[in-house]
A protein has these predicted regions:
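Conserved micro-motifs of the catalytic ATP-binding
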Residues: 80-84, 120-123
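Short beta-to-alpha transition helix within the HATPase_c
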Residues: 88-104
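Short conserved segment of the HATPase_c
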Residues: 175-187
Length: 192
C-alpha cells in the first residue's frame, strides 16, 4: 500500500511538472509571436527610411530576430518529433532566403555570400532554415580578422548516389580540434 501511494504521488508530481513545462513552452511560443510584430515594424521602418542610423537599427533588429527565433526553436526542441513537416524543399531558395534575411549583417561584416544549390531535397523547411541561419551566423561570428582574407560563405549542393549533400563552407577561423567533440552541446561557443 505504501509503495502504491508513493508511486501515485510520484506520477502526480511528474504530471504536474509536465503541465508546468507545457505551460512554459506555450508562454514562450506566445511571447515569440507577440515580439515578432514590433520586430517586423522596425524592419519595415528601417527599409522605408534608409540612412546610417536606420541601417544600424536594422542590424540590431536582425540580431534580435535571430535570437528570438533561437528561443522559439529551443523551446520546441523537446517536442521536435511532433514539429517535423518533411516535404520537398528547394535548397537554393532556402539558402538564398537566409542570405537575404541577413544581408545587412553580412554586408556590415564584409562577408560575401554565394549560393549554388540547384537541387531539391526532402527535409523540414523550418529546421533547414534554422540550421542554415545558425551556420551563417557562426560564419560571420568566426570570420578571419586577417585583412588579407576576404570572408565568404558558400552554400552549395553535391549529388552522391541517390542523395544530395548540402555543404556550407566558409574561410573563417574554424573550430579547434580539441573542441570538435563539444560542437553539439547546447550553447557551445568555441574559443577564438
Amino acid at each position: 500500500e505504501l509503495i502504491r501511494r508513493s508511486n501515485k504521488s510520484v506520477i502526480e508530481r511528474i504530471r504536474m511538472l509536465e503541465d508546468e513545462q507545457n505551460d512554459y513552452r506555450d508562454y514562450i511560443e506566445s511571447w515569440v509571436h507577440e515580439i515578432k510584430a514590433p520586430i517586423t515594424s522596425i524592419q519595415l521602418a528601417c527599409e522605408n527610411h534608409k540612412d546610417e542610423v536606420t541601417r544600424q537599427i536594422g542590424l540590431e533588429n536582425q540580431r534580435i530576430e535571430n535570437d528570438v527565433d533561437m528561443v522559439l526553436y529551443y523551446a520546441r526542441m523537446e517536442k521536435v518529433y511532433k514539429d517535423y513537416m518533411i516535404e520537398e524543399t528547394d535548397l537554393g531558395k532556402a539558402a538564398s532566403e537566409i542570405l537575404i534575411k541577413n544581408k545587412y549583417y553580412l554586408i556590415s561584416n564584409g562577408v560575401r555570400g554565394e549560393v549554388e544549390c540547384p537541387d531539391l531535397a526532402y527535409t523540414d523547411k523550418k529546421w533547414i532554415l534554422f540550421i542554415l541561419n545558425q551556420l551563417m551566423l557562426n560564419s560571420v561570428k568566426y570570420k578571419s580578422e586577417n585583412p588579407k582574407v576576404h570572408p565568404y560563405i558558400h552554400i552549395y549542393t553535391e549529388r552522391y548516389g541517390h542523395g544530395v549533400r548540402l555543404i556550407v563552407e566558409d574561410n573563417g577561423t574554424g573550430i579547434r580540434e580539441e573542441e570538435m567533440s563539444r560542437i553539439f552541446e547546447k550553447g557551445f561557443t568555441c574559443l577564438l
